[in-house]
């Protein structure tokens, strides 16, 4: 698959997710089979105003292609922000967020709010394409709500504006993450565009991935919430798509070792305090579905040092299966 002049050998994408896909987690997912990662979304305006905290979110991971994702609704600010994002990160492509459904983003006209103003969205893509020398991609939804589904028209505008690829989450903004993703609509988007289309939504594992790929004809798949605490889903989906035997998830002890490695990377990136805050969230996800893990989840909720992490990890590996 090609994203503009960028060759993609493994079109299995890790979705950009605020508060989740930091450098540490992207690094782990890339090692375990994600072919393309995207940073957490960053504000174009914050980049222009030289906010250092925002800039730190753009660290490029190794082991996969990596895109920098920005959001905003002013074409000129977005163009400036795009240039800065690439200067800071050295990422392989620039992704524009037109899919975030969170109220503080969407109600400000950013993220999925741009699906209510398709002409402005088109101007933003045109401005960003002119401003940067890497492929520009767009992530969007089906529309604002059930009564205003405009995904077909919207994605055609993105292509006309110069987008090199679109990723479509098969839900409207008003659905947030509820209901069932509409793969049929993604199929229709794929049928009308000549640029690559990536399917996103309800790709929960290898079986769902095969069904989605077959039904939509999408050029690639993007996995989001299904990888929380389970980065091995990329390994499994990659094998399924290649027609190979699907590997089993590692035993708990080995999964915990990967979790600890992730938190060590987070410490390198953010320092101990932030790494422990991230660990409280991610560690609990790594224990989803593990019997008798409630006691340890309570301990995880109050982690404050890396030594706490090592101690709890050792106890879990000893006591649980």
Q: Residue locations for each model-derived region?
A:
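Active-site beta-loop-alpha junctions enriched in small/polar residues
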Residues: 17-19, 42-44, 71-73, 99-101, ...
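N-terminal small/glycine-rich loop or linker at the start of catalytic domains
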Residues: 1-13, 45-65, 100, 104-108, ...
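Hydrophobic faces of well-ordered beta-strands that scaffold small-molecule active sites
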Residues: 12-16, 37-39, 66-70, 94, ...
